[in-house]
Amino acid sequence: MKTKLSHLAVGALLCTTGAAQAQGISAVQGLRFDVGYSLIKLATPPTSYDPVGIRLGISKAFFPGIDVEGVLGTGVQSGKNSVSPTLTKDVGPLWGAYIKPGMAINKDFGLFARVGFASTQIKNGDTHNGFSSGLGLNYALDRNMRAYADYTFYKTSDTLGISALTLGVNYGF
């Protein structure tokens, strides 16, 4: 159900991206760099883990309102098992490549989505590759800098879910 809602939201945002051109989602349409702090959820039903990570990103405006984005990240703190707290898991390296449509809500706030491919490794475990999507909100701190919050699904299946709430800042040139 979460995946279907995410797909619908991404589709709706793609359909309304033209509004971003008229409103000017950002004064900076060039290269952007971002860094974020991620609260990761590793769901392995019936249990889950809650590691913490960092994520770095770079994006470039492809068309007004549509960016191409690449992200790299890793876990920085292991997450405890929700049933047996002595068991822990950590996320290893992760990377993703995305198309990132966005639109202005007003002159300071913007809404964005991401849809693409991600590869996520669980330390001392498997690597998981596949479709990835997410939604986010950003706030213009000044002409070049934004604060953002996003929720991204890196892997969704019946046996494993990897998602993260990321809070960060990005800077554009």
Which residues fall in each region the model found?
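Residues that define the transmembrane beta-barrel architecture of outer-membrane proteins
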Residues: Q29, S48-I54, K89-W95, T127-S133, ...
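Residue-level signature of outer-membrane beta-barrel architecture
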Residues: K60, P101-M103, L137-Y139, F153, ...
